[in-house]
Amino acid sequence: MPRAGVCGCWGGQVLPLLLAYICYLLLGATIFQLLEKQAEAQSRDQFQLEKLRFLENYTCLDQQALEQFVQVILEAWVKGVNPKGNSTNPSNWDFGSSFFFAGTVVTTIGYGNLAPSTEAGQVFCVFYALMGIPLNVVFLNHLGTGLRAHLTTLDRWEDHPRHSQLLQVLGLALFLTLGTLVILIFPPMFFSHVEGWSFREGFYFAFITLSTIGFGDYVVGTDPSKHYIAVYRSLAAIWILLGLAWLAVVLSLGSLLLHRCSRLWQLIRGLDLKDGAAPDSEPRSQKIPISA
């Protein structure tokens, strides 16, 4: 019965997944509240105290004038202007910064620290995203497929069947290790050095960026007190694209690596039995295809 099939699907698959999803969200909300609410209250109290001290030191200002000034600062921040800077600071819309912004649009990262403020810019951003997001998905898919295709060379190691599984597992592990260093270790170290962050902050920025969460609390190339090279943010955009492609490969290879480790363990456990068998009756280890 079609109706019974739909009900069975909801009861057997969708409903448990929905409950797990809701529970996961509730768990995250509870932990974030416990970790962050007290710090937010302290920051709010500290800000109010600083405003009172400012009014005490500058008696020519009243509360209303200060609130208006704070509002101007907030509006400038929303439009991408850093209140700590001045008119001599580099533009947020030079080519390098614009290239970086375009990358955050098509990758759906959207840090939130910079957005079009003109009507024409907002309209263009909508149509640009409509075309750019699918293009980005197709590009990353093909780039990830190309990176993964290089691993198919492991299939040529067939001279020693007993070692083929080991070679394939080691090859995947080496690929994941080098990718982690190039994408998730070295770039945070570089960003930490340039931006004056700790490694924890640099790694946090890298993960939040490559996971396309993009909170906007840490963004490269936005400190007005630093002098960045012209291509700094453009290079960061290229790193984002390569990092997203690498993550796509990692997600697709993660289950494959676990499966091969399981096969390798079975192979090791069966070595004694295979050594006792006749040479011509020794089974060849079956290759697990890497490419889809």
UniProtKB/Swiss-Prot annotation:
Species of provenance: Mus musculus (Mouse)
Function, as annotated: K(+) channel that conducts voltage-dependent outward rectifying currents upon membrane depolarization. Voltage sensing is coupled to K(+) electrochemical gradient in an 'ion flux gating' mode where outward but not inward ion flow opens the gate. Homo- and heterodimerizes to form functional channels with distinct regulatory and gating properties. In pancreatic islets, conducts K(+) countercurrents for Ca(2+) release from the endoplasmic reticulum (ER) and regulates the frequency and duration of cytosolic Ca(2+) oscillations coupled to secretion of pancreatic hormones.
Binding site for K(+) 3: G110, Y111, G214, F215
Spans traversing the lipid bilayer: 14-34, 120-140, 166-186, 238-258
Entry's Gene Ontology BP terms: endoplasmic reticulum calcium ion homeostasis; membrane repolarization during action potential; potassium ion transport; regulation of glucagon secretion; regulation of insulin secretion involved in cellular response to glucose stimulus; regulation of release of sequestered calcium ion into cytosol; regulation of somatostatin secretion
Subunit composition and interactions: Homodimer; disulfide-linked. Heterodimer with KCNK17 and KCNK5.
GO MF, any single term: potassium channel activity
Family: Belongs to the two pore domain potassium channel (TC 1.A.1.8) family.
Name assigned to this protein: Potassium channel, subfamily K, member 16
Binding site for K(+) 4: T108, T212
Residues exposed to the Cytoplasmic side: 1-13, 141-165, 259-292
Record keywords: Cell membrane, Disulfide bond, Endoplasmic reticulum, Ion channel, Ion transport, Membrane, Metal-binding, Mitochondrion, Mitochondrion inner membrane, Potassium, Potassium channel, Potassium transport, Transmembrane, Transmembrane helix, Transport
Residues annotated for K(+) 1 binding in this entry: T108, I109, T212, I213
